[in-house]
Amino acid sequence: VQKERFRYFIKVPELAAFYNEITDYRTAEDVGVDRPHKNEILHHIPPTPEQEDFIQKLMQFAKTGDATLLGRPPLSETEEKAKMLIATDYARKMALDMRMIDPNYEDHPDNKASHCAKTIAEYYHKYDAQKGTQFVFSDLGTYQPGDGWNVYSEIKRKLTEDYGIPASEVRFIQECKTDKARKAVIDAMNAGTVRVLFGSTSMLGTGVNAQKRCVAIHHLDTPWRPSDLQQRDGRGVRAGNEIAKHFAGNNVDVIIYAVEKSLDSYKFNLLHCKQTFISQLKSGAMGARTIDEGAMDEKSGMNFSEYMALLSGNTDLLDKAKLEKRIASLEGERKSFNKGKRDSEFKLEAKTGELRNNTAVIEAMTEDWNRFLSVV
């Protein structure tokens, strides 16, 4: 089913002015909420040899639509129409872990799970005396009891086996099947007896007031909406975070893991652009007259040229894709301007003719009036 959404916005300052006529927008900073600052860290990860090989297959699939390259049956007629959405989904899974695509792939010391486990362990030991806690978010590879391999369990295995962190201090929010169990885990996070909590945006992003000891938040993937990222970060960047305030310079580190030659960085930057647009619109501080929200979303994936440029790692190709998009936009604006110009010229000519006719009528009527007055 074809989906439609707003992507391109014009006359943005006028839109912002109209919005601010009916709203009174204030941020936490505006009203002086006492909460930690967010320190974003983009953690770049080189692709593993298996990922490099799969990236080439993804590029060929995007060109040809040959699904057998990805180890799946040929695309149906319906799937063919959603080829770029399928390609985008595979690229997301590949960036998280190759075992998301095929569990027969081997572990690798430089994959995202290994980097995340190492970073979690560093924060764990750095704030061990204060019992600092950490949140780990991923909407892919979530924990499902008895459902085989998942990235949550893999990182927990590395934390316990490679870094000596007690298994009882690493929990998954999906383990909590009742409100009572959920509250017990939240209380344990605030007490510091649970130090690392994994979860998805929907299950851990809201209704979890476990910020008391939070020192770091880890994003293994990036959600589609800016509001979801804000909800994730809000687990630690909120009032009542005592450890961050007294022992971490009133900062909470937010680590975003991005595999090079994947869609990770692009998606994160796209999310930032959306959030900037929303914030500027609400505050009325708009600079640009037009906003392009971006071509990539969860319903349609991303366009072919940008997909190929990102996976190839060739920034020239990405710049070329952006310039081609800009040229197409300018050509559209030129056509619109020329059409408006022609319409205006036609109207001007018509009005000029009307003016000449009306002037002649006025002159004739004036002459008749003067003749009438002379007779009377």
Feature locations, PLM:
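Inter-lobe coupling linker of SF2 helicases/translocases
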Residues: 1-106, 110, 118, 122, ...
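Conserved helicase core region in the C-terminal RecA-like lobe
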Residues: 46, 187-188, 197-206, 221-224
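Conserved helicase motor "Helicase C" RecA-like lobe of SF1/SF2 P-loop NTPases
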Residues: 141-172
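Conserved helicase ATPase core of P-loop NTP-dependent helicases/translocases
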Residues: 166-201
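A short beta-strand element within the Helicase C-terminal
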Residues: 209-222, 253-256
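Conserved SF2 helicase motif VI
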Residues: 225-247
